[in-house]
């Protein structure tokens, strides 16, 4: 969870980082998605002959299969993401996304956005359910 927060919401206000984490929990609660944090974050398309390496740019979270290193380079931001992850996973936060399972940066408009209901904009992300 912390690594996903780091890559998806680094530089966002804390509430934006909480929102990214909450959207993962919302997916876990939805039977259309895997039922674990790792399952949701690592959900991707794989070649039939390689079940280990996801197909590039075919992941739910782009950082997971963009071909770049996933190792955090900003220790302070990773610490903050870890604290946010612990807070959300402990059940201490409320769902600020209003049930969102999807989000995107406000400077793009993905093909799936028209098929979902927008719920809220937090930081530079727009959330949908």
Language model features by range: what are they?
Residues 1-129:
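Bacterial extracytoplasmic/cell-wall-associated proteins, especially those involved in peptidoglycan
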């Amino acid at each position: 969870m912390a690594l996903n927060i780091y890559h998806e919401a680094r530089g966002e206000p804390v509430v934006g980082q909480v929102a990214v984490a909450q959207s993962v929990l919302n997916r876990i609660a939805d039977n259309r998605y895997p039922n674990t944090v790792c399952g949701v974050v690592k959900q991707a398309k794989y070649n039939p002959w390689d079940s280990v390496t996801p197909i590039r740019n075919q992941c739910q979270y782009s950082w997971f299969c963009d071909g770049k290193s996933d190792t955090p380079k900003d220790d302070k931001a990773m610490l903050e993401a870890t604290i946010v992850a612990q807070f959300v996973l402990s059940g201490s936060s409320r769902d600020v996304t209003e049930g969102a399972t999807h989000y995107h940066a406000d400077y793009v408009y993905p093909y799936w956005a028209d098929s979902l209901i927008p719920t809220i904009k937090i930081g530079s992300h727009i959330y949908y359910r």
